[in-house]
Amino acid sequence: MYEGKKTKNMFLTRALEKILADKEVKKAHHSQLRKACEVALEEIKAETEKQSPPHGEAKAGSSTLPPVKSKTNFIEADKYFLPFELACQSKCPRIVSTSLDCLQKLIAYGHLTGNAPDSTTPGKKLIDRIIETICGCFQGPQTDEGVQLQIIKALLTAVTSQHIEIHEGTVLQAVRTCYNIYLASKNLINQTTAKATLTQMLNVIFARMENQALQEAKQMEKERHRQHHHLLQSPVSHHEPESPQLRYLPPQTVDHIPQEHEGDLDPQTNDVDKSLQDDTEPENGSDISSAENEQTEADQATAAETLSKNDILYDGENHDCEEKPQDIVQSIVEEMVNIVVGDTGERTTINVSADGNNGTIEDGSDSENIQANGIPGTPISVAYTPSLPDDRLSVSSNDTQESGNSSGPSPGAKFSHILQKDAFLVFRSLCKLSMKPLSDGPPDPKSHELRSKILSLQLLLSILQNAGPIFGTNEMFINAIKQYLCVALSKNGVSSVPEVFELSLSIFLTLLSNFKTHLKMQIEVFFKEIFLYILETSTSSFDHKWMVIQTLTRICADAQSVVDIYVNYDCDLNAANIFERLVNDLSKIAQGRGSQELGMSNVQELSLRKKGLECLVSILKCMVEWSKDQYVNPNSQTTLGQEKPSEQETSEMKHPETINRYGSLNSLESTSSSGIGSYSTQMSGTDNPEQFEVLKQQKEIIEQGIDLFTKKPKRGIQYLQEQGMLGTTPEDIAQFLHQEERLDSTQVGEFLGDNDKFNKEVMYAYVDQHDFSGKDFVSALRMFLEGFRLPGEAQKIDRLMEKFAARYLECNQGQTLFASADTAYVLAYSIIMLTTDLHSPQVKNKMTKEQYIKMNRGINDSKDLPEEYLSAIYNEIAGKKISMKETKELTIPAKSSKQNVASEKQRRLLYNLEMEQMAKTAKALMEAVSHVQAPFTSATHLEHVRPMFKLAWTPFLAAFSVGLQDCDDTEVASLCLEGIRCAIRIACIFSIQLERDAYVQALARFTLLTVSSGITEMKQKNIDTIKTLITVAHTDGNYLGNSWHEILKCISQLELAQLIGTGVKPRYISGTVRGREGSLTGAKDQAPDEFVGLGLVGGNVDWKQIASIQESIGETSSQSVVVAVDRIFTGSTRLDGNAIVDFVRWLCAVSMDELLSTTHPRMFSLQKIVEISYYNMGRIRLQWSRIWEVIGDHFNKVGCNPNEDVAIFAVDSLRQLSMKFLEKGELANFRFQKDFLRPFEHIMKRNRSPTIRDMVVRCIAQMVNSQAANIRSGWKNIFSVFHLAASDQDESIVELAFQTTGHIVTLVFEKHFPATIDSFQDAVKCLSEFACNAAFPDTSMEAIRLIRHCAKYVSDRPQAFKEYTSDDMNVAPEDRVWVRGWFPILFELSCIINRCKLDVRTRGLTVMFEIMKTYGYTYEKHWWQDLFRIVFRIFDNMKLPEQQTEKAEWMTTTCNHALYAICDVFTQYLEVLSDVLLDDIFAQLYWCVQQDNEQLARSGTNCLENVVILNGEKFTLEIWDKTCNCTLDIFKTTIPHALLTWRPISGETAPPTPSPVSENQLDTISQKSVDIHDSIQPRSADNRQQAPLASVSTVNEEISKIKPTAKFPEQKLFAALLIKCVVQLELIQTIDNIVFFPATSRKEDAENLAAAQRDAVDFDVRVDTQDQGMYRFLTSQQLFKLLDCLLESHRFAKAFNSNNEQRTALWKAGFKGKSKPNLLKQETSSLACGLRILFRMYTDESRASAWEEVQQRLLNVCSEALSYFLTLTSESHREAWTNLLLLFLTKVLKISDNRFKAHASFYYPLLCEIMQFDLIPELRAVLRRFFLRIGVVFQISQPPEQELGINKQ
């Protein structure tokens, strides 16, 4: 303690002694000073003695600590100060210096704190007086330089010292003094020191304010831990030990700043700054001590974390605060948010500060700040969004309530406000200083005004750059920025002084970085009125443009800013389209447009262009950066053999090297240089891209409507109504005209003045929406005319004024001035005339006041208006004209012609005028928006980039295209290329196809590779373009889609160029060049092929030119280019599934173009296709199959290329790829091999070249031989190719294909059967095709043998088929053997039968039935149904050959054969087939007998007989019914009715005999008549089977005998009739055979005859048919049915044979040869068969029930037969009946006597008649016996002995 005091005393003593010792002090005028020093010295001495400590405590206090204060100390300090005060007031610099030096040290070491009240001025502290004294030492420029320096030091110490506190006016005074020293001092060192001091002071003032908030935040954190149950209890600040003297200052000292301190800093004007009080009152509210202090606690808490961040960002201070505050603040904010949001509803006491809406404004900004600085990991925005405006209110109310209960307000909180006020005052003063106008004329760099302006701006910049969170968020400062700083900037931002202008720009940049969320409107004004205006106006100077564009470079490099500008302005209905305009302006600058008028040098123009390009590229880079999360780098992953990596993996996999490969494309180097990107701030709810897009669309509609309105108002309004943006009522439209400021005012006037009814309604509504209440007439008129320009026509003005007057009176009904509306109307008109007269330059003689008054005489209902009234109007108009609304042009002023700007000087003058106007506008606008609170959205979504890019892609493209086109500067080119790269990236990421394609096409165009004359002009920039294009392909391949076409086209051309560059002859396809060699070798002046190929040169060549071309494109062959191109193809494995398909698709397209070139087809791309196929084969199969779909299709086309070399290359490549692909094998049920090998099929199908076909077959054969074990689904294609080869006519192709097929069927099937099952059908089909190739019969037979071999596989391995699953899952497992095995084999055999020549088809038929017979036992019932559907196709009439002879042969051979085979199979598998097949067989037989083929017809009946005889025993009743019905049907359809009805057509050829034929002759002829059936060979049991093999039908011979003269239709008819006759007879025979077994009847007849010859009486010659015939299986009804058929047939034959006339006619017409036709055999055999059946039934005991009917039928039939016999005239006819009669008589003789009686009595007379004929002996013998029996039975006579006992039953 003692030591401290001692130090202090030592200082004081020395200083006082030094002052006393000064010789000046000795002078009289310093007596007071001298005395004060002496008194002070004495006191010090006395005090020292009094307080000297006892011995032991000498070291008790640390000498470094300031002493503890007590009341006495204050008084002492006061005493000590007086001598220094007097010393400072002395005029002697030395004394002043000494005094200042001592004060500075005392303050520095804490010995002088000045905390005591000032005894001279109540309400102030001593320290204020001390500072005032120090400041007073500066007396202006004449002050001693040493003193100046001491003042600066003392003030800096005072402001920065830890030990004293100075506030408000005192701080201002200290700052002002330093400022003035800087301006006034002539000494450069002093100036520099003053400036540095100012900077440091400001740093301290603002840093203190921020630190205090941080302390408070820490304090609150402690408090929070201490009291968990409350959100905030009034925190008692426990201050740190190093500042124990902090005290709470009464509120009034804070609130009310005494006026003498408020002067501005500028020395020239020390006026009192009154505005301070007005400003600060509402901002701080009435009671800062309670409510507001606490209200800011939250601000400080929330701001603390940002403080640490910002310090790091700005100047690296406060590193120690970096970590803890973050954690502290995080927890505070989190809890606060949760509780506040929860409690909002309950808190009602809201303390709103004096200006009423302060609460809400402040709240908005604060809560927004909390969100902005939202701590990572806490969902603050979620918690905060619901009630932004209320949150802060509730916090403040909560604080207020609690502070009432607490023991006393916390000093810390109050103190913080004083610090804020200090900062605020300094900031505001600097703003005001910067606004001071400069003197007119060219600015003088040394003038105080300019230096002051520059210094103030520099200091403001420094404050802003180092601003902490309180400054950035506190309402007071934000308002200060809006009201003072922005207005100041709007004045300085157009300064012609470069330094001022530049500083303004820097300040603007800082504002944009750190404060943009609060300054939405201000930023808009800045861009619109200053930046863009300077860029757009042609007169602005290069320097200005340059500085603006430099600034823009900074802005454009920050992604957050760029996106924010778009979201907040372009997507805001009421804001200008700043982003769009910015891009357009930059694009124009980058294109070098408009530089002519600027008078710029070329160098300047180029540097400006580069800057413009740089900005554009920066913007695009930002957009890339912003959307980088959407981009997947193809090179950081591979698509081979794995799925896409997950989101996490992808982000981890973006290795630094891949990211940095393209500078800042994946991640721009740094965006937070300005701190913009460091945190996002949010005000208006959430950032919803869709919502903004909708707004943008609406805005575009409105803008379009406004454009249309400018051209034609009605059209504009109609458009907006159609788009739903404007209502239809006049009121809606009027409101729109009021509110929409962008409308052209002239057009608005025209529209309102129009005489149209609707327009008038709108005009009335428009005027009615004005409220003129309480306004004087002129003000009302001014207000009315502000909205539009009056139209020119008097009538229109008339209407408007009339309505205006009416509305004015309506609003001001209490006025007494105007008698009526008419008065107002006339007066309004006169005012407009007056304004025109007084202010129009065209009017030379201006109207005087008297004239004006005179003009208005008598207008008030014939009275005058008061003269003084009119006089006042005149004066007002003369002073200020009525200005109508001007239309503000946003567009760039039209290019001023050369005359306008004759010289640079004039241009400058014009520009300065423009700048002044601009400054006025900007200032006015700035002031207008200074109180507007506009919500600012901080963009966070990457989706915004899409609409941004869509909006601006054209100006970007224009700038880059023009740059590349017309400028050879490498930097320009590299910027353009980089820009295009970024643009492509964005278009890619968001898949905006049109734009992407446009950029890629532009890039491709500038490679000059695709232009016909391109390569000759190739420069470095074109080479770079090629490299860029390749890079794009490498980095953006996943997104390129159709743009691959351009890229691959260029790469294809590049290869050609490289060949020329290296002088290598391109490898054309030999075939085409061969033809041209002859013509080329002769002419030595002609260019080599490749030059012609590229379209480089015409016929004759300048070889020098070629050399230079080779040189210029040599660069394209550089290793780096070659490798890069190669990398595109090798890297194709990394493209994703869709991208690789696009890539391949366009590679194929380019390859196609190369190959289609008429002059020089090339195979570059084709080779690349093969390469990428190799690379990508490892992809997952799903992707690979999509790739191959495209490549395979390409191979299809290339393999069919007319140029054989191309096709050979394609097929060979296919072979190699296939081999590799097959090595991979294939799992069951996949079909990739099938897809892969399909091109072989296609080529085989379409390419007719034997060479290629042979090659395809060889390739496939090679695959089979080497890869058989791996082939699965590929077998299908292999068989398909062989199938196509099988029908070839070239022996070697067929031979090789068949050999291989045979190898597969015999060996491969054996080993790998399960793998081949899927293509088993194809194999069989293929063999069938070989069998059907008529050119190679041996192969055909061998093929059928192999099919038979296949059947063995099916039989041996049914399980394999059952287990095989495939596409046809709907096939039941048990049916798979059939569907995939048996059916194909049998079907193909049926195809062979249907397609081949006789010997092959016969073999096929044999094998087919052989298979059925061999393996049929394994077949299911429904399989047989399918099978016979195939088999019966053999008989399908539609499929039979057309030619008659072939058809006949077919029927005679194949059908015949098949029919017998079917019956055999049926018999073999009767049990299964009876239900299945019988109906079909009957139907088929029925079909056979209907064909015009005798052989087939016979076979049909024959087969019917076989089937029934062989299987009848097993037939059911139902089947017998079917059998009988079938027989019946055949019978009915084959009765040749036409024989009876046929009539010769008139004009029939005459009979062969020319002479008329007499009856006798006819009769003799009739006796020789020919039986139609004579030609039929008798059927014996043995020859039945051979019948089918009879080569040609006998009927055919008969047909040929038919008269050649007969007409063809008749010939056909007769042939058919003949066949029907044959069938009838066959059928009778069949029935006989079925019922009684074949040959039985014939034997019986023979025996009957023999017996008759012997005249034997032994009637036991009964042939036993019991065992064999089917008689016993037929029911009586069925037998009767058959009988009916037989008898009908018999009757028909009888009718025909009796019809002599008809027979003659037929004979004459050529039917049946030389003699008349008859049907004797049919007549007799049908009856014979009928009789046998009836007699058999008659004697059958089991049919006793039918005997009665049988007897009746017998009697009728027999009597009818006998009667008919008696009518026969012809000998031969009677002879035919011999056997019949024998049969009849024999049978009757054998019946019992009873029955015999009945019969004999019935036939007796007829038999008597018969005896008159000349009968043969046998018949006579039987008749004799018959009559004898009659005698005995009727007991007429006794029987002879040998006959006794016979038939007595």
UniProtKB/Swiss-Prot annotation:
Processing after translation: Phosphorylated. In vitro phosphorylated by PKA reducing its GEF activity and dephosphorylated by phosphatase PP1.
Tissue expr: Abundantly expressed in kidney, somewhat less abundant in lung, spleen, and brain, and still less abundant in heart.
Domain of life: Eukaryota
Listed Polar residues bias regions: 350-360, 394-409
Primary location group: cytoplasm
Biased composition range(s): Basic and acidic residues: 46-58, 644-658
SEC7 domain residues: 709-840
Biased composition (Low complexity): 664-684
Residue numbers of Phosphoserine PTMs: S52, S286, S289, S290, S397, S410, S1079, S1566, S1569
Motif (Nuclear localization signal (NLS)): 711-715
Stored Pfam families: BIG2_C, DCB, Sec7, Sec7-like_HDS, Sec7-like_HUS
Assembly mode: Homodimer. Interacts with ARFGEF2/BIG2; both proteins are probably part of the same or very similar macromolecular complexes. Interacts with FKBP2. Interacts with MYO9B. Interacts with PRKAR1A and PRKAR2A. Interacts with PPP1CC. Interacts with NCL, FBL, NUP62 and U3 small nucleolar RNA. Interacts with DPY30. Interacts with PDE3A. Interacts with KANK1. Interacts with TBC1D22A and TBC1D22B.
Name of the featured protein: Brefeldin A-inhibited guanine nucleotide-exchange protein 1
Organism: Bos taurus (Bovine)
